[in-house]
């Protein structure tokens, strides 16, 4: 009996022993921490740029710091994998989290880097390199020295990289084309700073607006010129970045997209149909007037 009680006490004491958690790799912990920190800094830098709280250069420096932290998170994640494998430590989930956050932040900048290597370092694109639309009202908003078109060297680079950026010619009156362009600019929620519709005294129509890039919200300036050409209309467009020497193809894409939408809008508008002419009814022959009997 006494032996049975002793065995029971030993069993209960073993059951009450504290459970020791598996030690976690500190490298994995720091990988996930740096990943989250990089993510927070990247989001903060985007908010700063879009809201205009800081100038472009400090905001971009903040975003670059986020990318550096993301790269460190990836390196620590791979180091954690080695430590976990060799020492049998825990923390695989945290290492994977740090790797995922780091790769997520670096994926889009890496894609932009490949575009920067393929495309020329230009940031002022127009459909008319000989006589580009002018920035008039926008000239007050652009940095000094970035108002005039760069010249023939940039035009040659543009023609080689974006041969499809050409004027849009339409078989419609100038006012119709201008209204279609203005409607699409408004639909895109660009900040319109000047509109000059074509009138009897001024044949050309002009639209000046500010567009923003989707993620960072950089401001790019847009000028649209609508003028008569023969029996129809010609639309020229210019899109230029305010900062930087490389737009990564953003301005050419903006021009291409808007002109295609204008063309589609004009093509889908039904032409007014003229009403069929009414045939003249044959004249009635004169008939002898019937005399009504006199009322009594």
Residue ranges and their predicted role:
Residues 1-2, 231:
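Feature targets compositionally biased, intrinsically disordered low-complexity regions
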Residues 2-43:
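Membrane-anchoring hydrophobic segments
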Residues 20-23, 77, 118, 161:
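Preference for short coil/turn "hinge" residues that link or interrupt alpha-helices
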Residues 26-84:
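Membrane-embedded alpha-helical segments of integral membrane proteins
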Residues 47-52, 82-94, 109-296:
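Ser/Thr-rich, low-complexity intrinsically disordered terminal regions
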């Amino acid at each position: 009996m006494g032996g049975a009680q002793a065995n029971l006490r030993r069993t209960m004491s073993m059951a009450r022993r504290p459970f020791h958690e598996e030690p976690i790799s500190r490298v994995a912990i720091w990988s996930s921490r740096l990943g989250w920190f990089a993510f927070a800094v990247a989001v903060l830098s985007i908010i700063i740029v879009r809201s205009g709280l800081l100038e472009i250069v400090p905001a971009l420096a903040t975003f670059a710091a986020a990318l550096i932290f993301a790269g460190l998170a990836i390196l620590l994640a791979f180091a954690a994998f080695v430590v976990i494998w060799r020492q049998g430590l825990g923390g695989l989930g945290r290492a994977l989290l740090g790797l995922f956050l780091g790769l997520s932040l670096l994926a889009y900048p890496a894609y932009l880097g490949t575009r920067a290597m393929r495309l020329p370092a230009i940031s002022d694109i127009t459909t008319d390199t000989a006589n580009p639309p002018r920035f008039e009202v926008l000239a007050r908003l652009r940095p000094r020295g970035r108002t005039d078109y760069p010249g023939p060297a940039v035009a040659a680079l543009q023609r080689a990289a974006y041969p499809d950026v050409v004027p849009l010619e339409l078989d419609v009156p100038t006012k119709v084309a201008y209204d279609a362009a203005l409607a699409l600019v408004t639909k895109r929620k660009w900040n319109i700073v000047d509109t000059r519709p074509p009138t009897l005294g001024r044949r050309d129509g002009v639209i000046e607006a500010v567009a923003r890039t989707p993620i960072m919200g950089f401001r790019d300036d847009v000028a649209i010129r609508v003028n008569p050409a023969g029996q129809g209309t010609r639309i020229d467009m210019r899109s230029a970045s305010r900062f930087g020497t490389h737009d990564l193809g953003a301005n050419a894409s903006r021009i291409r997209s808007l002109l295609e939408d204008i063309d589609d809008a004009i093509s889908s508008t039904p032409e007014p149909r003229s009403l069929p002419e009414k045939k003249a009814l044959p004249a009635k022959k004169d008939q002898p007037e019937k005399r009504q009997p006199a009322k009594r």
